[in-house]
């Protein structure tokens, strides 16, 4: 597998911890909206927010990919939103991995803040579903790459 560089450039890595996940079977559009929402948050607040999204108690505002997205209660200053449960669960796992990396490096986990989080489209896993009369319909699965950098605030 090829070495993947981080989109975030840093000179001194002593005060930061990183984690990434590739080829996650989640929607790239949902991942972009979640990353935008938790970017800059403190680690504990971000984890709590993602857990609330998974329990469908708090929606994620869809600001870019919001065509035909219904309104949700609890969004301040924005109407359209959704509950991307699957994407929130996968991003939460990567966030917990970054926290474990920070703990291993000896950083104070109480002071950690998300200084960089990004998601990029990965390759599409091609598939198909057999249909009547010998035909087939494409059934593709999008993948997503996620990168997280935590730093002490």
Swiss-Prot record:
Record's Gene Ontology CC terms? cytosolic large ribosomal subunit
Write out the entry's keywords from A to Z. Ribonucleoprotein, Ribosomal protein, RNA-binding, rRNA-binding
The protein's matches in PROSITE patterns, at most eight in alphabetical order, are given as: RIBOSOMAL_L22 (PS00464)
Against InterPro entries, the record matches this protein to: Ribosomal_uL22, Ribosomal_uL22_CS, Ribosomal_uL22_euk/arc, Ribosomal_uL22_sf
Q: Which GO terms describe its molecular function?
A: rRNA binding; structural constituent of ribosome
One example of a Gene Ontology biological process annotation: cytoplasmic translation
Q: How does it assemble?
A: Part of the 50S ribosomal subunit.
Its family remark reads: Belongs to the universal ribosomal protein uL22 family.
* UniProt cross-references to PANTHER family, sorted A to Z: 60S RIBOSOMAL PROTEIN L17 (PTHR11593:SF10)
Chain's role = This protein binds specifically to 23S rRNA. It makes multiple contacts with different domains of the 23S rRNA in the assembled 50S subunit and ribosome.
Q: Give the protein's recorded name.
A: Large ribosomal subunit protein uL22
